[in-house]
């Protein structure tokens, strides 16, 4: 009977070890799909009154589509295309490029903001997801005037 008890203990220990390894592997951040991957192309310097283009490329690792809004926010008042809010449907394997042409009159720091939103009539058949963890992504850029 004592040998049977030892066998159960060894089996139990082995199962606990397997479960622990499985849990740790499932929590690995490298295997988690990212809702948004953002690449920003903006010059770091510009001449006074020079028009520059801010280009933002957004893609997703999700299999489902999502509705995203992209816009720029600045510490200084800006005019024109800088204030445009662009809304698009983002799907896997189809990156989206947003463009803003802005005129630099002084050194400016701005945020590029991407919101994942619930909005109808953007994605086909209104089939889109919104992640539970986060729905706003942003990054800061500075364009210095020469």
Curated annotation (Swiss-Prot):
GO terms for biological process: regulation of immune system process. It is found in: Secreted. Residues 1-26 form the signal peptide. Disulfide bonds join 65-91, 89-123. InterPro entries: Ig-like_fold, Ig_E-set, PIP. One of its GO terms (cellular component) is apical plasma membrane. Lacrimal and submaxillary glands. Gene3D superfamilies: Immunoglobulins (2.60.40.10). Keywords: Disulfide bond, Pyrrolidone carboxylic acid, Secreted, Signal. Monomer. Interacts with AZGP1. This is Prolactin-inducible protein homolog. It comes from Mus musculus.
